[in-house]
Curated annotation (Swiss-Prot):
Membrane-protein topology: Peripheral membrane protein
Name of the gene this protein is made from: ndhH
EC id: 7.1.1.-
Swiss-Prot/TrEMBL GO biological process terms: photosynthesis, light reaction
Subcellular location: Cellular thylakoid membrane
Function field: NDH-1 shuttles electrons from an unknown electron donor, via FMN and iron-sulfur (Fe-S) centers, to quinones in the respiratory and/or the photosynthetic chain. The immediate electron acceptor for the enzyme in this species is believed to be plastoquinone. Couples the redox reaction to proton translocation, and thus conserves the redox energy in a proton gradient. Cyanobacterial NDH-1 also plays a role in inorganic carbon-concentration.
Keyword Cytoplasm: no
PROSITE patterns from the UniProt entry: COMPLEX1_49K (PS00535)
Coiled coil: none
Database matches in InterPro entries: NADH_Q_OxRdtase_suD (IPR001135), NADH_UbQ_OxRdtase_49kDa_CS (IPR014029), NDH1_su_D/H (IPR022885), NiFe-Hase_large (IPR029014)
GO molecular function terms noted in the UniProt entry: NAD binding; oxidoreductase activity, acting on NAD(P)H, quinone or similar compound as acceptor; quinone binding
Keywords: Membrane, NAD, NADP, Plastoquinone, Quinone, Thylakoid, Translocase, Transport
GO cellular component: plasma membrane-derived thylakoid membrane
The name this protein goes by in its record: NAD(P)H-quinone oxidoreductase subunit H
Amino acid sequence: MAQLETRTEPMVVNFGPHHPSMHGVLRLVVTLDGEDVVDCEPVIGYLHRGMEKIAENRTNVMFVPYVSRMDYAAGMFYEAIVVNAPERLANIKVPKRASYIRAIMLELNRIANHLLWLGPFLADVGAQTPFFYIFREREMIYDLWEAATGQRLINNNYFRIGGVACDLPWGWLEKCKDFCDWFGPKIDEYEKLITNNPIFRRRIEGLGVIGKEQAINWSLSGPMLRAAGVPWDLRKVDHYECYDDFEWDIAWEKEGDCYARYRVRIEEMRQSLKILRQACEMIPGGPTENLEAQRTVEGKKGDLSGFDYQYVAKKVAPTFKIPNGELYTRLESGKGEIGVFIQGNNDVTPWRFKIRAADSNNLQILPHILKGAKVADIMAILGSIDVIMGSVDR
């Protein structure tokens, strides 16, 4: 009896750009052999707005409000890197108090970034409840930002060349300490719900494995790199702002899979709390209300009126000219290394302003770790990378 010969043809499927699990306007052209992924081609650019060219046609002071729109989950990080570049090029020194305020804002943003990653990632793999919990914690960070900057999520416009826009309001540091005390047990709550949940672990363990050498060769950074066994954190490596004053540990794992990336981000939130507590205690001058009272007693020529106790150095004029020269500066955001290459020509606008987005680099490895995976695992692997298409496309 003749037997029927069966043969399957590869099938091409489009994921996105309008798909509820795509984390933005990302399109994946996926080639499938049954349930297995044979190839994947990311199509980007749907959210391109020419941010680098905008930067080259604006003064640096004018460009700061733009950058938080690139990554709405990491607005403070982009504000920091955009002011750090001309500061280093022009050798502008930042007061110690301003540096501490910056570090506090950056660590709050790191926690907010990881929370906004955690909720949708868990929803992608089928755990809906924690998605609603994360907004409870983010709301408290929004309140702290609103009290200090006037804005809650994006367009904080708080960082300035030479420092920050204004000092912390009265009672703000105490509220920040209260948040740290309140948020610590919430991380424990997440871990009880998620970390050792057998369904969650079976769903993501062993998915999207990235080796140590592979992570380095693909220029990955942030949790993607540290989850692959490379304990590399720019806060330790580059010694920027005042991070050398704090005691904290680099969060890293060896497995390189989706579960390792989850563990790294959970531990990073704990380390951020440790940094926040130390910064609130060690900030030069202490709480604003105490600092102002002591200045009144000492007078204008007292020690607490010195440079390191100010929230900003000499305020930069709107006509501030970027000196001749070029440099690349970088910092560690919640997603990894973000950097700016700036080239000045003694003009109010930079001649070249190149932005390196962490999630843009991290996304490049997606086709390679998807090959051989099941179609149902695509969203889990993509979600573990943590991409925001505004900064990928710029």
